[in-house]
Amino acid sequence: MLQTEMKVIQQTEIADKVYELILTGECVADMSPGQFLMLKPSRSDLLMRRPISICSYDKTAKTCILLYRVEGDGTRDFSKLSEGDTIDVLGPLGKGFDIDQTPAPKTALLIGGGIGVPPMYQLGKELAGKGVQVTFVNGFQSAKDSFYEKEMTAYGTVHIATVDGSLGTQGFVTDVTKNFPEEPDVIYSCGPKAMLQAVKASFPETKTYLSLEERMACGIGACYACVCPKADDTKKQFKVCEDGPVFRADEVSL
């Protein structure tokens, strides 16, 4: 973990209220798929950092890409960043996805919902680099909310589900996966809790990893704001920011 400043290379709105923020800094060297950064807004009245998932990184170039949706004052503040600006960053944080499994999987299904789609990109890139056959399933409310379909096709097959049917399959991600003829060797998923519950229920026998989206305050496990009950004893809890955000599906009670 490192508190540092990163410099803005570029920022672009790539979907409705969804921004692609490209940063450069030394902390990129320590990043792994599924981790996140805690960004500090520039406004003095916004005291809490905001957690943003790492979409991708290039350790040679020392750059990373964050995708986020403007939902409040903090992310609205980030959306005003431009080339050359600096931002106070804490990270990379959390335990990411396990991609070095034994035996190595031959097929992987990566399921993302909304702003849970970004961490699937780097994960898919690294799995594909290991020779794994990758399938992405991305869920959005509408076509105007969708992003990174073209980028993901470089590493696997991409399926889209939209609630209003304006792009891809009408419905939810599970309306896509229920038609797949075979189950994958491993599943990775990130998105809203209801989606993760549906994914977990749909593939009870498949090794599944879930990246949980919880509101965070500190990002380092000190404040207990982002807890999740353990599956084997719901009176005990994981700290999502420190113990996760990625967990085996059988570890957590959603």
Curated annotation (Swiss-Prot):
Question: SUPFAM superfamilies in the record, alphabetically?
Answer: Ferredoxin reductase-like, C-terminal NADP-linked domain, Riboflavin synthase domain-like
Which GO terms are recorded in the biological process aspect for this UniProt protein? 'de novo' UMP biosynthetic process
- Residue ranges of the FAD-binding FR-type domain? 1-99
State if Iron is listed as a keyword. Answer: yes
Swiss-Prot/TrEMBL cofactor(s): [2Fe-2S] cluster; FAD
Q: Provide a Gene Ontology MF annotation, just one.
A: flavin adenine dinucleotide binding
- Return the Pfam families for the record: DHODB_Fe-S_bind, NAD_binding_1
InterPro entries from the entry? Cyt_c3_hydrogenase_gsu, Dihydroorotate_DH_ele_sf, Dihydroorotate_DH_Fe-S-bd, Dihydroorotate_DHASE_ETsu, FAD-bd_FR_type, FNR_nucleotide-bd, OxRdtase_FAD/NAD-bd, PyrK_electron_transfer
How is the cofactor bound here?
Answer: Binds 1 [2Fe-2S] cluster per subunit. Binds 1 FAD per subunit.
Residues reported in the UniProt entry to bind FAD: 50-53, 67-69, 74-75
Pathway-wise, it operates in:
Pyrimidine metabolism; UMP biosynthesis via de novo pathway; orotate from (S)-dihydroorotate (NAD(+) route): step 1/1
Per UniProt, the keywords (alphabetical) are: 2Fe-2S, Electron transport, FAD, Flavoprotein, Iron, Iron-sulfur, Metal-binding, Pyrimidine biosynthesis, Transport
- Show the CDD domains listed in the entry: DHOD_e_trans
Q: Locate the residues binding [2Fe-2S] cluster.
A: 218, 223, 226, 241
Q: Which domain of life is it from?
A: Bacteria
Query: How does the record describe its quaternary structure?
Result: Heterotetramer of 2 PyrK and 2 PyrD type B subunits.
This chain belongs to the protein called Dihydroorotate dehydrogenase B (NAD(+)), electron transfer subunit
Q: What is the lineage of its organism?
A: Bacteria, Bacillati, Bacillota, Bacilli, Bacillales
